[in-house]
Amino acid sequence: MSRTTLVEAPEEVTAAAPVVPRRQRSTRRWRRVVSPVVLVLGWELAARTGLLAAEKLPAPSDVLATGARLSRDGTLGIHLLDSLTRAGAGLLIGGLLALVLGTVAGLLRLGDDLVDPPVQMARMLPHLGLVPLLIIWVGIGESLKISLVALGAFFPIYFNTYAGIRDIDERLVEAARTCGLGLAARLRHVVLPGALPSLFLGLRLAIGAAWLSLVVGEQVNAQTGIGFLMMEAREFSQTDVVVLGLLVYALLGLISDLALRVLERRMLTWRRGLRAT
């Protein structure tokens, strides 16, 4: 009679994502607010005590009062809408073109040979230095502003799309091909997820470059926009309006970056990076 020994199978161990306590998250949020609040309070105190001349740098409270006044009469809203429209159009045009060319250069050897060399040469030129040439090509109207934003957004998205595709492990693509996945399925299930982290980085850099380009573009023969509002205020020495315009640009950049971070976290739930300690 044979004797059978039963051996228990080891329990499956799954790695759980680290859970950050709610109290720790709340403390971190407060820490991120401390330095801006201290900076604004110091600015206000320096302006009120006369360390900063009002005509050079007005107090934050005066800038906020000016912003409230321009918001009530609709001036700020009109200029803000025009700036957002230009930024959105430029980002869409430059981003789509960069995405297509970056994908072609990253996936195809022929595309790499034909597309990448001229793009590499063009990126050595400061796009803001092309303003005189762009004026000759597209005039000094809306096309100039949108073209500057599109150029500013193009290069970060192109290079990060290209690098994201090239950094994908070729063995994953071969495994997908072995499993019978067609080209479209490989692009969807292997290439796109692998390139997304790099693509999001390119988008964040592109947004910053787009706002910088818009600042310059709206100071060239513009009739509306935050940049035009600042230039008009400069002529009348309205420093509070100039500072308000700078704060609006800064807030637009911050809000767009935060929105992109939220979208990135939701789309890349599978990706676990290093947490700051």
Stretches found by the model and what they are:
Residues 1-37, 258-277:
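Transmembrane alpha-helical segments of polytopic membrane transport and secretion proteins
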Residues 109, 166, 197, 201, ...:
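C-terminal transmembrane helix and the adjacent membrane-cytosol boundary/short C-terminal tail
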Residues 18-26, 49-93:
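Periplasmic/extracellular loop-to-transmembrane helix junction in inner-membrane transport proteins
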Residues 117, 160, 164-205, 230:
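Short cytoplasmic-facing helical segments at TM-TM junctions of multi-pass membrane proteins
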Residues 120-156, 163-164:
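Generic hydrophobic transmembrane alpha-helix motif, especially the helices
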Residues 147, 151, 183-217, 240, ...:
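Transmembrane alpha-helices
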Residues 86, 232-253:
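Pore-lining and gate-forming transmembrane alpha-helices of multi-pass membrane transport proteins
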Residues 89-119:
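Transmembrane-helix boundary motif in ABC transporter permease subunits
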